[in-house]
């Protein structure tokens, strides 16, 4: 499902569609508040760092979780990620094994994260954190658990796409938010805004006055793998929260983007779909390229035919964010 364009209107001028849907947005916000108030959070004997967002859809949580996991491991931790496993069939808690699990079972994000840390899929997030702690985690990264009241958190990071900000500031379906900005940030410890300098300036201008917690800025940058994208003809496809950002990155790298296919977030990459894309790429004389997250959903027969453009987080104040992480999760002795 594509997000309506009016979700990205200026908060001061949300549009008639948003105003029409505002009563439903208020009901959604109240339902979220009631669910959060009824929560009885479980505490585990290791620190829990939550990485979530206020917006529905993709804001960059997965690369943020990867960055956090790598820094915690560098500090001597044994980080485990606990995630719901969106799109997967397994209820869990189950420890993800990329050698035997498929995206249809555990979801695409857990398979990607499993390259950087131990990962647990659990529809019951509290049970997942208990399983991770029992299996030897020294710190738990709770992926997309900000609106989940079942687990006590030691540090809550709200990730936001700086270019999109918090949209028109309204709750679903009047806007993109899972809960109002003020109430959400009241539970947060930090906002991590992802975007280039222009997007960061725009975010501060629009939302700076609403930020009640520290702001750290970062940007997603292509990982240097030796691939020369300059003038490379490509047919790009992406089933992530913000496919346009992926296509812009390819253009910025100099790729000759012959065609861009925006898929729904987590859309299955069926053999029929991939055969169509392969045929179109052949007609265009283009190389198929996708994101790391989409690549884990590729049918086996197509994995050698598609290349990826991996991205990694570059944090402007890396030492500051590392210090915040280690204050919440001191390194083990």
Swiss-Prot record:
Main EC class the enzyme belongs to: transferase
Superkingdom of the organism of origin: Bacteria
Record-listed E.C. numbers: 2.7.1.130
One Pfam assignment: LpxK
Keyword Nucleotide-binding (UniProt): yes
UniProt pathway annotation: Glycolipid biosynthesis; lipid IV(A) biosynthesis; lipid IV(A) from (3R)-3-hydroxytetradecanoyl-[acyl-carrier-protein] and UDP-N-acetyl-alpha-D-glucosamine: step 6/6
Keywords: ATP-binding, Kinase, Lipid A biosynthesis, Lipid biosynthesis, Lipid metabolism, Nucleotide-binding, Transferase
Annotated InterPro entries: LpxK (IPR003758), P-loop_NTPase (IPR027417)
One BP term from GO: lipopolysaccharide core region biosynthetic process
MF (Gene Ontology): ATP binding; tetraacyldisaccharide 4'-kinase activity
SUPFAM superfamilies: P-loop containing nucleoside triphosphate hydrolases
Binding site for ATP: 55-62
Catalytic activity: a lipid A disaccharide + ATP = a lipid IVA + ADP + H(+)
Keyword Cell inner membrane assigned: no
One cellular-component annotation, GO: plasma membrane
Family to which the UniProt record says this protein belongs: Belongs to the LpxK family.
UniProt function note: Transfers the gamma-phosphate of ATP to the 4'-position of a tetraacyldisaccharide 1-phosphate intermediate (termed DS-1-P) to form tetraacyldisaccharide 1,4'-bis-phosphate (lipid IVA).
HAMAP family: LpxK
Name by which UniProt lists this protein: Tetraacyldisaccharide 4'-kinase
């Amino acid at each position: 499902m594509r997000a309506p364009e009016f979700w990205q209107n200026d908060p001061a001028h949300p549009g008639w569609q948003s105003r029409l849907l505002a009563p439903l947005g208020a009901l959604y916000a109240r339902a979220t508040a009631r669910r959060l108030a009824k929560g009885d959070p479980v505490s585990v004997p290791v620190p829990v760092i939550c990485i979530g967002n206020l917006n529905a859809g993709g804001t960059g949580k997965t690369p943020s979780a990867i960055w956090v996991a790598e820094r915690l491991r560098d500090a001597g931790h044994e980080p485990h990620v606990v995630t719901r496993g969106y799109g997967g069939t397994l209820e869990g808690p189950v420890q993800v094994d990329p050698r035997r699990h498929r995206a249809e079972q555990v979801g695409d994000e857990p398979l990607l994260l499993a390259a950087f840390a131990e990962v647990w899929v659990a529809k019951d997030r509290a049970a997942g954190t208990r399983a991770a702690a029992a299996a030897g985690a020294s710190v738990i990264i709770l992926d997309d658990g900000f609106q989940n009241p079942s687990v006590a958190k030691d540090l809550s990071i709200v990730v936001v796409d700086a270019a999109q900000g918090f949209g028109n500031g309204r709750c679903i379906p009047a806007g993109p938010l899972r809960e109002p900005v003020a109430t959400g940030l009241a539970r947060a410890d930090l906002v991590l805004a992802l975007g280039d300098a222009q997007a960061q300036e725009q975010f501060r201008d629009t939302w700076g006055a609403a930020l009640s917690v520290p702001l750290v800025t970062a940007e997603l940058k292509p990982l240097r793998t030796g691939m020369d994208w300059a003038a490379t003809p490509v047919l790009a496809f992406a089933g992530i929260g913000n496919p346009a950002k992926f296509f812009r990155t390819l253009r910025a790298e100099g790729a000759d983007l012959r065609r861009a296919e925006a898929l729904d977030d987590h859309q299955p990459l069926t053999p029929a779909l991939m055969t169509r894309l392969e045929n179109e790429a052949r007609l265009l004389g283009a190389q198929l390229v996708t994101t790391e997250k989409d690549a884990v959903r590729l049918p086996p027969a197509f994995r050698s035919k598609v290349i990826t453009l991996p991205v990694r987080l570059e944090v402007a104040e890396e030492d500051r964010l590392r210090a915040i992480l280690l204050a919440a999760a001191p390194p083990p002795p």
